[in-house]
Amino acid sequence: MSAPKATILTADEVRRAMTRIAHEIIERNKGAENLALIGIHTRGIPLAERLAAKLSELEGVDIPTGMLDITLYRDDLSEVAHQPIIRETQVPFDLGQRRVILVDDVLYTGRTVRAALDALIDLGRPVGIQLAVLVDRGHRELPIRADYVGKNLPTASSEVVKVKLHETDGVDSVELWDLEDLK
C-alpha cells in the first residue's frame, strides 16, 4: 500500500482539537449539566468517550455516553452489502431530559448524520441535538452542519480522509489519501 498524501493532524493536534471542542461545548451549553454524548459507530464512539472524559474533568460532572449503530437507517443500504453488519446500539440513559451531542469522526455528505438522527429519534426525544466532528471535509448533499469541528478540511471528491484513533488503530492521526491509492 502506498503512503498518505498528507498527515492532517498528529496525535497532539487531535488531542488539542478534542480539548477545544470540549471547551466550546461547555461555553455553548453554559456548562455540562444534562449533556449526553453518543458516538456513531465506529470511530465516533471513542471520540465521544474522550469528550465525555474531558468534559467531566473540566466541569466535575459525569457525562453519560452511548453508542449508535445507523446501519439499518442508511439510505444506501442496498448498495452496501447483501448482509450488512449490524453493530450494537447502546444508550443507557433517558434521552428525554438530555441535550445530546452526536459525535463522529468525519462529516462528508451528511447522510451518516441524517441516519443517526433517525436512529436517535426512534430511541426517544432529547431536549436538543448537537453535532461534534473531528473533521469536516465539505461536499454536503444534505442541509446538515456540525456545531463543533476539530478541523475544517476542504477536499476533492477523489480524496479520502482516514481518521486513526488509538482505541481502534493504535495511533491518533488524520491522514489525507487519494482514493486510487486505497484500491
Swiss-Prot record:
Keywords: Glycosyltransferase, Transcription, Transcription regulation, Transferase
Transmembrane regions: none
Reactions it catalyzes: UMP + diphosphate = 5-phospho-alpha-D-ribose 1-diphosphate + uracil
CDD domains per UniProt: PRTases_typeI (cd06223)
Superkingdom of origin organism: Bacteria
Gene3D superfamilies registered for this protein in UniProt: 3.40.50.2020
Motif (PRPP-binding): 100-112
NCBIfam families noted in UniProt: PRK05205.1-1, PRK05205.1-3, PRK05205.1-4, PRK05205.1-5
PANTHER family registered for this protein in UniProt: BIFUNCTIONAL PROTEIN PYRR (PTHR11608:SF0)
Function: Regulates the transcription of the pyrimidine nucleotide (pyr) operon in response to exogenous pyrimidines.
Family, similarity comment: Belongs to the purine/pyrimidine phosphoribosyltransferase family. PyrR subfamily.
Protein name: Bifunctional protein PyrR
The organism of origin for this protein: Deinococcus deserti (strain DSM 17065 / CIP 109153 / LMG 22923 / VCD115)
Classification lineage: Bacteria, Thermotogati, Deinococcota, Deinococci, Deinococcales
Gene (UniProt): pyrR
